[in-house]
Regions:
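PRPP-associated nucleotide enzymes
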Residues: 1-181
Length: 181
């Protein structure tokens, strides 16, 4: 375990089981559809790479970079999109692939932006859900959820603090003294 991690929540084996479960469900739900997975950079990259291999259907992938954190541990409430899709999505069933559903503002904004472009459908898949942190007024519900996590700062498997810890093969709780200095 990394010296800055207080506790491990999900080991590699746990994450693999979560991804396999989600992949099977998406495969069942999207049979015969024109699937486009949209990865929200950067935190979702590990999850997306594993999830797309667990989906037993043809699918396209693309990437968006959107965030509401900046370099902080608390959302500032403003969602900025710095990288957009390369596809005309009007003929696709979209699944937005997110690392963590926290305040909900990022996913809500992306859902609104993509829905306005006229795809066949837009769904949301998040590896982690942190319901205690949901922002007031966010009504978006996840279509696919990997697991719930406590109201703590989590890192690993793509999730970071200040661009560190993304490469950890597990998800753990970061020690508060690391980010409170």
């Amino acid at each position: 375990m990394h010296k800055d991690v207080k506790e491990i929540l999900f080991l590699e084996e746990d994450l693999k089981k979560i991804v396999e479960r989600l992949g099977k469900q998406i495969t069942k739900d999207y049979e015969g559809k024109n699937l486009l997975l949209v990865c929200v950079l950067k935190g979702s990259v590990c999850f997306m790479a594993d999830l797309m291999r667990a989906i037993e259907l043809d699918c396209r992938i693309d990437f968006m970079d959107a965030k509401s954190y900046g370099n902080s541990t608390v959302t500032n409430g403003v969602v900025s999109i710095s990288r957009d899709l390369n596809y005309d999505i009007s003929d696709y069933d979209i699944i937005i692939v997110e690392d963590i559903f926290d305040s909900g503002r990022t996913l809500e904004k992306l859902t609104q932006v993509l829905s306005a472009r006229g795809p066949r459908s837009v769904a949301c898949c998040s590896l982690l859900d942190k319901p205690e942190r949901r922002a007031q007024g966010v009504e978006l519900k996840l279509d696919y959820t990997g697991a719930q996590v406590p109201d703590a700062f989590v890192v690993g498997y793509g999730l970071d603090y200040d661009e560190k810890y993304r490469n950890l093969p597990y998800i753990g709780i970061l020690k508060p003294e690391v980010y409170s200095n």
